[in-house]
Amino acid sequence: MAKKILVVGGGGREHAIIKALKKSPDCGEIWCAPGNGGISYDAKCKNIKATDVDTMVGFAVEEKFDYVVVAQDDPLALGMVDALAKAGIPAFGPDKAAARIEASKVFSKDLMKKYGIPTAKYETFDDPAKVMDYIRAEGKYPVVIKADGLALGKGVLICENEQQAADGVKEIMLDKKFGASGNHVVVEEFLTGPEVSVLSFTDGKVVKPMVSSMDHKRADDHDTGLNTGGMGTIAPNPYYTPEVAAECMEKIFLPTIRAMNAEGCPFKGCLYFGLMLTPDGPKVIEYNCRFGDPETQVVLPLLESDLLHIMQSCTNGTLAQQEVKFSDGAAACVILASGGYPVAYEKGKPISGLVDGQLPDEENVTVYHSGTAITEDGQLVTNGGRVLGVTATGPRLTNALSHAYEAAEKISFEKLHKRSDIGLRALKALAEKQ
């Protein structure tokens, strides 16, 4: 029987999840809360804050949803899945205890240390003076300082010298730029090597990795500018070879799931592994307790299996029997952002080039809406830092990239900013392999 589904969140990731869920014959009516302008072309939107757990659960009960996908980190950390379970509604995503793997950097680093999962050398602190004493004593730069709690993906500072480190500690721990998330910090060694993002499905027993991807965090070309939530992605990641994948499964993926079980907080949902392929082998940079954004926008378009069935098997503990298959092709996503992102930017700029949120007459191209709104007179306008993600799929990465950029050229709004070099690092890696 067709299921009535609610997706919690309101960005490009949620849009990609909704579009993938709609391919399932078992997907009936689909809602998104809070959603956004562009998502409203694909799902009914209800303006409830993703972090308002009580109102969201009340809405889910009242509307008799059969299944809820909690896609955003904050509501997961606040225990939305627990609250839904109490109300008798099955959901995709970890409970509050398991969501700590992302919500607390201290928890995740201590977990890795205890269970021998490869990661950067680190120390944790709650006293700003002691942080600087430690950094001076180590005397190694660059050094990485991370806020313990959630900080919209912006709570990681790479400091090149003592002054930058002191400024960073002040910003996180004293000025409380990220609020209580900065009460504790993790200071860790700077790792080098290619980065790989691997999202995985897990029911707390088995892990089924999705196709690998490569993120582009910096705002500007040549990896310069400030860190953002991500300016584009490609999949698959050429550095993630079958040999690397096997090593990650044995030393990182399965040990992480077993560690969470041993700690009494089994993880069910999407576990995202942020990895660095160092000269000493793969190491974990970070865990996320949900789909990445914009990684989801390249990974799910390549999924050939039924996403709803996969998600339900994660919830029910039957993932071992569930097929998780991806196409052999490639995907590329280019983010169109508001000028000034990630600092100050204007909203409400009219967007041209789209019909019902998509590019007409474009095959193998999907536009995912991150920050858009529809005005009272029906005009699609910008409403965020990251506005749109243009994803193209193709048999090879070169096709997907050129197609994504060609398609992106057809969309315009005032002060549009995009990187022109998404995927170049990956193409270089592919060329070196040949």
Residues of each region from the PLM?
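ATP-binding N-terminal substructure of ATP-dependent carboxylate-amine bond-forming enzymes
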Residues: 1-96
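Solvent-exposed alpha-helices and their adjacent loops that cap or buttress functional pockets
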Residues: 23, 38-40, 62, 92, ...
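Short acidic-hydrophobic, aromatic-tinged amphipathic segments that line or gate anion-handling sites
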Residues: 46-52, 123-127, 159
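A conserved helix-loop-beta module that forms one wall/lid of the active-site cleft
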Residues: 92-155
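Internal nucleotide-binding/catalytic subdomain
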Residues: 155-296
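Active-site "cap" helix and flanking loop/linker of ATP-utilizing ligase/carboxylase catalytic domains
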Residues: 249-271, 288-362, 375
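Generic C-terminus detector
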Residues: 372-377, 381-434
